[in-house]
Design a protein with these regions (language model features):
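Hydrophobic secondary-structure block in the mid-to-C-terminal portion of proteins
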Residues: 136-142
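Short coil/turn segments at secondary-structure boundaries
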Residues: 28-31, 125-129
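Short beta-strand segments
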Residues: 30-66
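Short strand-connecting beta-turns/loops that link adjacent beta-strands
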Residues: 56-58, 93, 142
Length: 142
């Protein structure tokens, strides 16, 4: 069995779900992972993505739509751009949330905070001409 540090994509999601995040929440270099549940904009099917996150206040979390610095945004970002009502799972806590792109005023500080936990985001931004967005996931009532 591989360690959570080696996990990517579907195997990461599977282990996270099977263990309520006991295996998969803690990842590389002290980063923590949440699961983002979106509705596929074309298929309508549930999509689940493991993402590095950081808390933003009491009831919100931030993630970065980097896709490794490619010129195309990740599918999960396109999905939530079409349907911002999502679900988030942090360890065993799964809850509804509303996704929004950080405002121009918020972006610099939130970007700085995210690069503190994953410095590679700065390299990703240098690789692309698109502004890599920080996404705020705000907990909502069920």
């Amino acid at each position: 069995m591989s360690s959570a540090l080696d996990l990517h994509g579907p195997p990461h999601v599977d282990r996270y779900l099977e263990t309520n995040g006991e295996d998969g929440y803690n990842w590389r270099n002290g980063t923590t992972i949440l699961l983002l549940f979106t509705k596929g904009r074309k298929s309508g099917e549930e999509r689940i993505n493991p993402l590095i996150f950081r808390d933003h206040g009491d009831d919100a979390h931030t993630v970065v739509a980097s896709r490794g610095g490619t010129d195309e945004p990740p599918s999960w970002f396109l999905n939530l751009s079409e349907e911002p009502n999502v679900e988030v799972q942090i360890k065993g806590d799964r809850f509804p949330a509303r996704a929004r792109v950080a405002t121009d005023a918020e972006q610099p500080e939130l970007w700085k905070r995210m690069t503190e936990v994953w410095p590679d985001y700065d390299q990703y931004q240098q690789k692309t001409s698109r502004q890599i967005p920080v996404v705020v996931l705000e907990r909502t009532k069920a």
